[in-house]
Amino acid sequence: VFLFSLGMEKVVACSYKRPNALYRLICFPWAGGGTSRLARWGRLFSSSIEVYSVRLPGRECRINEPFAQDMTSVVNEITSVLLKDLQEKPFAFFGHSFGSYISFAVALHLKEKYGLEPIHLFISGAHAPHSEAFLPIKRLHDVEDEAIIAHTKILGGTPFELLQSEDLRKNLILTLKEDLRVLQTFSFEKAERNIPLSCDITCFDGSEDTAHDLEAWNGVTSGDVSIYKLPGGHFYLLEPSNEIFLTKHITICLEYADL
């Protein structure tokens, strides 16, 4: 019998359980995001890959829990819940936007503390964490609610009806602000001699999104870094044709990682 522990149920959504999968793909959603969209990717992968989608406090079944205060507590919680699973079989991380920074912070912690590393890191819509371009994003949480709504509309990806309903809108703004507050507490200074990771990194970006400093991801790994631009804006990954490209590409990377 394949049972999720209570901590696991709380922190991870796994819509398509595959206990015999060869690999696990751990997905980290965007700021203000829940687990459902990336958890559904499970159906697009073959039986060799099981998909987990990470859930932070303050949303979905964790709506009554206080939001995370900082990146350290986010990383510690995710690590403690997932550690056993990550030691069990090869795993990769996929993060979009805010989720990219969390996935990188978790990867750093796993490497430093446990000598564990993803076989591949998939980054989407995000500057490298030591890039100058990343700094303005860290200041976003202080802005007015209306500015956040305007920013959300420009980015797209948020259903219009969410922004129409007063309660849903308030909740979305609050969650976004809290997620951005977590981002403020994260800093990664790249030491000249110490390249923290050795896995390959693939960076994806929407061709019409604000350009991200993807080249700088070369500075955090001794592995290869590849860059792909897919049609669309910041939420290009929600387009069905792009979802198919992403899941096929991720599958190839995971299946060849062991060769």
Per-region residue spans from a language model:
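Hydrophobic alpha-helical signal peptides and transmembrane signal-/tail-anchor segments
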Residues: V1-S5
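Domain-scale detector for complete catalytic domains at protein termini or as standalone homologs
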Residues: L6-F94, Y101-L259
